[in-house]
């Protein structure tokens, strides 16, 4: 026992207590500030809905015809409703153009843009951003689907802290049983 202590004294007396102390402090801070955080969210939600800024949702993609409709449906279920959907077709050679044209005519998407020559996702995103009219821009993949309150959760940090300039999200794979690649991402 003494040889273990003499060899690993730093671990037992410095590192482990430091780790556990910090862990307990973080947990304690979360528990004591939970009401404050919820109050900040409620105030931010009030200001968000009072201002009601337009959000531009950019959806660049190539050969995403089979996914676009599901993504548009998940956006239709959002709790935050003031948004425009800009789909940029990056030179698809499947039936994406037909589906997006139908969605545009039916009013489900605001803009449908098509690049005849493939330029890649960045070029499609930049092209779509030129058409964006919103105060905020959200970039989505065509095969994405969102929780009902995702747009609201994306926007709230801008109203909680005025220094926030960008927000990222936690992406979870929902179709993790479909392909080997999707199961590896999950």
Predicted regions span which residues?
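Cell-envelope/extracellular polymer assembly enzymes that use nucleotide-activated donors
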Residues: 53-56, 84
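A conserved acidic beta->alpha catalytic loop
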Residues: 81, 89-98, 117
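The conserved acidic donor/metal-binding loop of glycosyltransferases
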Residues: 141-145
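Short, acidic, metal-binding catalytic loop of nucleotide-sugar glycosyltransferases
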Residues: 73-82
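N-terminal membrane-anchoring/stem segments of glycan-assembly enzymes
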Residues: 1-48
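Long helical/loop segments within the catalytic core of UDP-sugar-dependent glycosyltransferases
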Residues: 22, 102-107, 111-114, 120-124, ...
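Short aromatic/hydrophobic "clamp" motif used to bind/position activated sugar donors
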Residues: 137
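Acidic helix N-cap motif at the loop->helix transition within catalytic regions
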Residues: 69, 94-102, 149
